[in-house]
Amino acid sequence: MVLFKKNKYALLFVALLAVSSSAWVVRFLPELSATTIAFWRMSLASLMAFAISYKTILTFVPNKKILLAGVFLGFHFALFFRSVQLTSIAEAALLGTVAPVFTEFYSIIFQKKRLSIKVLGGLFLALLGAYTLLSQSSFSDTSTFGNVLAVLCSAAMAVVLLVGKDVRKSVGLFEYSRWLFFYAAACLLLISLYQNVNVFSFSFQDFGWFVFLAAIPTTVSYTHLTLPTIDRV
């Protein structure tokens, strides 16, 4: 923990490593819909966050910004898990985690932010990596659609990061996360009703993977990605 507090890049590396693990887990759940996987990931993550921050349950009231972020997070996961089912893990994992590229472009266009050489270099490497990977893609209709969904899920995540950065200035980490995940789960439940998907149809083994997704790629990763130290990388 001392290393992470002193080295924000080590913290960022661990967070990104944790979030990338969700892509291959989906391959172990081929019979389940993307919405079902996403719903249980968010629901269990919300319960974990509530359990960790139970002392402030009655004293903190979530605001509309957290609701907005939660809705976009719900769409992010629905799109991401569907993209993993349609394209390769490598393409989904890369294209589904380029949200920082969108946030930086937002800063350039709307906030007139001047980027450092390090950030510009990072953006260049991210775009180069995406181009290199896609140049080797099969470009089938299914794969292409999956890649489009992965990019859209990153755009949705960019909204979550931008809103979260503002909210986290005055709200505690788990006070924010528990309601963020709760609203995302509620959004996914509504999506499942629209799709006529039964999110309660799964095996005991499937539930074990849900717990993993909630604990590692979500609680460990997404909560750390909203830390102030990460915002200043």
Residues covered by each model-derived region:
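Loop-to-transmembrane alpha-helix entry segments
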Residues: 60-66, 93-96, 109-132, 143-147, ...
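Membrane-interface helix termini and inter-helical loops of multi-pass transporters
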Residues: 25-31, 134-143, 194-209
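Conserved small/polar residues in nucleotide/adenosyl-binding loops
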Residues: 223-229
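Loop-to-transmembrane-helix transition segments
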Residues: 7-17, 54-82, 145-153, 200-220
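Hydrophobic transmembrane alpha-helices of multi-pass small-molecule transport proteins
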Residues: 49, 73, 115-135, 154, ...
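Glycine-/small-residue-enriched transmembrane alpha-helix faces in small-molecule transporters
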Residues: 1-39, 68-71, 79, 140-166
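Specific alpha-helical transmembrane segments that line the substrate/conduction pathway
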Residues: 36-38, 42-47, 81-114, 153
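Transmembrane alpha-helical segments that form core, pore/gating elements
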Residues: 16, 45-49, 103-105, 109, ...
